[in-house]
């Protein structure tokens, strides 16, 4: 199958775009789920977190204390991988050469801070789905209560049998049953003042 050639253009206001490249939110999400996409996720999320999902490599570099070239390379390599993985289009820049940022970004323009790019809406939606599903999976597979299992609760029942209320409170201190940072000091004070 012949590759579709998509052209990046520059409009009168100086914005570069190649329009819709035909990659849906579902396709972007599917691409993000591949192991090969993992090295690029944090960079894409950095752009996603910016207002209107726009940013320059230099602004990202300052904000996240990473070289600007890091963002340039990550976006370029992700776009090359997407183009190769989908195998149905290539994007030609205004200079007549292959270009890649326009695959991931819906438009870009020159600013005093550097060239600013905006992530594609479909990719932003796919990243949101990815984050939501990743979070659900982490909770599903992770240990409850920040790594604590609940066996200690059953041990507490055994430890507090036939024990006074004050002794029960002393045994609860530091056991992650309640918000320890706020409550432990109150419980200690109550135990000391009886």
Language-model segments: what does each one mean?
Residues 1-8, 150-194:
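Short, low-complexity, charged amphipathic interaction modules
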Residues 39-47:
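Short alpha-helical "packing" element that flanks the helix-turn-helix/winged-helix DNA-binding module
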Residues 48-52:
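Short helix-capping/hinge SLiMs at alpha-helix to coil transitions
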Residues 68-78:
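Short amphipathic alpha-helical interaction segments
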């Amino acid at each position: 199958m012949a590759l579709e050639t998509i052209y990046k253009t520059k409009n009168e206001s100086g914005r570069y775009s190649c329009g819709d490249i035909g990659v849906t939110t579902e396709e972007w999400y599917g691409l993000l789920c591949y192991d090969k996409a993992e090295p690029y996720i944090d960079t894409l999320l950095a752009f996603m977190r910016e207002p209107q999902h726009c940013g320059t490599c230099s602004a990202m570099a300052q904000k996240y204390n990473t070289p600007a070239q890091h963002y340039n390379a990550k976006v370029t390599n992700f776009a090359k991988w997407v183009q190769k993985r989908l195998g149905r289009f290539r994007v030609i820049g205004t200079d007549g050469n292959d270009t890649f940022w326009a695959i991931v970004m819906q438009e870009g323009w020159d600013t005093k801070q550097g060239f600013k790019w905006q992530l594609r809406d479909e990719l932003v939606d796919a990243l949101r789905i990815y984050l939501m599903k990743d979070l659900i999976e982490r909770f599903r597979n992770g240990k409850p209560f920040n790594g604590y299992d609940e066996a200690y609760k059953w041990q507490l029942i055994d430890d507090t049998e036939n024990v006074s209320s004050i002794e029960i409170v002393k045994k609860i201190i530091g056991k992650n049953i309640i918000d320890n940072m706020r409550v432990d000091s109150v419980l200690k004070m109550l135990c000391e003042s009886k």
